[in-house]
């Protein structure tokens, strides 16, 4: 029995109007021509405003600072107009040198990477240049831009620790010029100081409105420094075709834009070289002397604080460090062999409580002031046979009368496990369940 396919369902006129064939054939040639006429100018504008390399022969500074010529590029109209093959005599005398060349060479040997973020990230190393051969009486404008090195996209191969070509580059983004905020400079200023582009920020936000330089991630870029001789009619930098300028390129400043560092050696070198990356340095980078001082400082502050320790003990660290450490040790290690009266006397330095009026008898010398003074209420507490007995106002009032209480001798138990719990928990453990606390005002 032969199979006969069922006939295709027929669409209604309304449904047929929204079919794929009807939608594809609905556009007229006139509409397509009008659409192309509006898109082509935009594409041409993007291509012209984001040229990968300057056209023609521009001045390139090699490692020795000599003037050379670069081969012509395929771009027809770059953002920065072409410098003449032979610059004017005045501009030809100007030379530019990279101040941080040694640091750039270290990064260049590993493959420099620059972080780009949505909000913008500053460059490190920073491009710092100095000029010579300028006219001291003239005014100059210094600016910088960053252009793609090639039309390729890269990826980092971790097993080879190298950058490999991953494909064709993404569509170029609009190029931007960064004019140094201190421009225009006088020639005298350029001869005495260097120009630092430390405020340049790199971003991957195509809608950025803060003047940051927009880059694509995983693409290689080349920074360029331009110097323009300012004339009287130079009002803006929108059109540089009529200006006299010079471009300088340093090959060691080529970098790859990334959203996260790929090479761990680059990360380590940036942490070691960047003074603003101190937060990423761990304690293992300390020297032996610094490590010993830190360890001794930690040991001095690692003792357990007694919840019933008298006031004024912190001042002992400045006066007699050895005596204070000994007092603290006696409070925690030999308390079982001391009575409460002798223990309080050894820790406070007083046999009994001294009223504030009687402090004049101590004198005003520095030695007497360095002696720890117990807290009035804390030093006057009566030594009951049990620390858990209620401290009523009447008992406190009776203890405050007279020149000072007399402490009966009795054996003091160990409180090591209470002190390890912290001051508040230790007091709660020492206090009897029926204790009534009276607030001191």
Curated annotation (Swiss-Prot):
InterPro entries: p53-like_TF_DNA-bd_sf, T-box_DNA-bd, T-box_sf, TF_T-box, TF_T-box_CS. Residues 103-282 bind DNA. Expressed throughout all cardiac tissue during later stages of development. Also expressed in the cement gland, jugular vein, lung bud, cloacal aperture, rhombomeres 2, 4, 6 and 8 and in a subset of motor neurons. It comes from the Eukaryota. The keyword Transcription regulation applies. It is found in: Nucleus. One of its GO terms (molecular function) is RNA polymerase II cis-regulatory region sequence-specific DNA binding. GO terms for biological process: cell fate specification; embryonic axis specification; endoderm formation; heart development; lateral mesoderm formation; positive regulation of DNA-templated transcription; regulation of transcription by RNA polymerase II. Coiled coil: none annotated. Disulfide bonds: none annotated. CDD domains: T-box_TBX20-like. Keywords: Developmental protein, DNA-binding, Nucleus, Transcription, Transcription regulation. One of its GO terms (cellular component) is nucleus. Transcriptional regulator that may be involved in heart developmental processes. This is T-box transcription factor TBX20. It comes from Xenopus laevis.
């Amino acid at each position: 029995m032969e199979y006969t396919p069922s006939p295709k369902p027929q669409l209604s006129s309304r449904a047929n109007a929204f079919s794929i064939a009807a939608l594809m054939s609905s556009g007229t040639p006139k509409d397509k021509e009008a659409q192309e006429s509006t898109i082509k100018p935009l594409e041409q504008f993007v291509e012209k405003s984001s040229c990968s390399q300057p056209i023609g022969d521009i001045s390139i500074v090699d490692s020795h600072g000599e003037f050379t010529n670069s081969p012509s590029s395929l771009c027809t109209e770059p953002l920065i107009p072409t410098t003449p093959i032979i610059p004017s005599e005045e501009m030809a005398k100007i030379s530019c040198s990279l101040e941080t060349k040694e640091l750039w060479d270290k990064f260049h040997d590993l493959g420099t990477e620059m972080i780009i973020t949505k909000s913008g990230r500053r460059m490190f190393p920073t491009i710092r240049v100095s000029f010579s051969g300028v006219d001291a009486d003239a005014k100059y404008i210094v600016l910088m831009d960053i252009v793609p090195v090639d039309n390729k996209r890269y990826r980092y191969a971790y097993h080879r620790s190298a950058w490999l070509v991953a494909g064709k580059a993404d569509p170029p983004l609009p190029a931007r010029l960064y004019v140094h905020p201190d421009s225009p400079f006088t020639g005298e200023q350029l001869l005495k100081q260097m120009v630092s582009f430390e405020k340049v920020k790199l971003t991957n936000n195509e809608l950025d409105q803060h003047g940051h330089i927009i880059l694509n991630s995983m693409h290689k870029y080349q920074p360029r420094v331009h110097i323009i001789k300012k004339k009287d009619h130079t009002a803006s930098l929108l059109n540089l075709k009529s200006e006299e300028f010079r471009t300088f390129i340093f090959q060691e400043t080529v970098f790859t834009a990334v959203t996260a560092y790929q090479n761990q050696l680059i990360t380590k070198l940036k942490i070691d070289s960047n003074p603003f990356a101190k937060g990423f340095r761990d304690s293992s980078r300390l020297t032996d002397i610094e490590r010993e001082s830190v360890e001794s400082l930690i040991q001095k502050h690692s003792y357990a604080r007694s919840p019933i320790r008298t006031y004024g003990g912190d001042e002992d660290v400045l006066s007699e460090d050895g005596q204070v450490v000994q007092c603290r040790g006696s409070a925690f290690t030999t308390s079982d062999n001391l009575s409460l009266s002798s223990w309080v006397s050894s820790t406070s330095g007083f046999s009994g409580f001294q009223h504030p009026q009687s402090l004049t008898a101590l004198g005003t010398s520095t030695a007497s002031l360095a002696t720890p003074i117990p807290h009035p209420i804390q030093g006057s507490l009566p030594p009951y046979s049990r620390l858990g007995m209620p401290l009523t106002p009447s008992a406190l009032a009776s203890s405050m009368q007279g020149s000072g209480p007399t402490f009966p001798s009795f054996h003091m138990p160990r409180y090591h496990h209470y002190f390890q719990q912290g001051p508040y928990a230790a007091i709660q453990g020492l206090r009897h369940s029926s204790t009534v606390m009276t607030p001191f005002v």
